[in-house]
Each structure stands twice: as C-alpha cells, then as structure tokens.
Swiss-Prot record:
Organism: Mus musculus
GO terms for biological process, alphabetical: G protein-coupled receptor signaling pathway; negative regulation of cell growth
Subunit structure: G proteins are composed of 3 units, alpha, beta and gamma. Interacts with beta-1 and beta-2, but not with beta-3. Interacts with KCNK1. Interacts (via C-terminus) with KCNK2/TREK-1 (via N-terminus); this interaction confers ion selectivity to Cl(-) and L-glutamate.
Descriptive protein name: Guanine nucleotide-binding protein G(I)/G(S)/G(O) subunit gamma-4
Record's signal peptide: none
Keyword Ribosomal protein: no
Keywords tagged on the record: Cell membrane, Lipoprotein, Membrane, Methylation, Prenylation, Transducer
Taxon lineage: Eukaryota, Metazoa, Chordata, Craniata, Vertebrata
Family: Belongs to the G protein gamma family.
InterPro entries in the cross-refs: G-protein_gamma-like_dom, GGL_sf, Gprotein-gamma
Gene3D superfamilies documented for this protein: Transducin (heterotrimeric G protein), gamma chain
Function description: Guanine nucleotide-binding proteins (G proteins) are involved as a modulator or transducer in various transmembrane signaling systems. The beta and gamma chains are required for the GTPase activity, for replacement of GDP by GTP, and for G protein-effector interaction.
Amino acid sequence: MKEGMSNNSTTSISQARKAVEQLKMEACMDRVKVSQAASDLLAYCEAHVREDPLIIPVPASENPFREKKFFCTIL
C-alpha cells in the first residue's frame, strides 16, 4: 500500500513540475492588449482590402471557377 502512495506522490510532483515549467514559459511571453491587437488586425485588413477576393471579386476573365458558357445538347 505504501508503494501506491509513493508512486501517486511522485506522479503528482512530476505533474506539478510540468505545470510550473509551463507557467514560467507563459510568464516570459510578450503580451498585447486586446484593443491593440484588434487595431492592428483592422489596419492589416484595410491595407490589404484590394487583394481580398471576398471584398473585391475576381474578374470573370481571371476566375478559374467561373461557369462555362458552352452548352452541350444530346440529340
């Protein structure tokens, strides 16, 4: 019975060490305020609006997925 408790204790110590290492890594990361990230994202979207085919459609002549205008009839 004592071995089971020792093994369980070792496992929880190992998990705690991993958690501490993870928290140390996260504490060193640079953080950005949400308002700043949103502002940066908005500026990026506005700067690249002309390249976005969902906002400015691709000209039909350049669209590889356009409908073909050829009709085939079977007689």
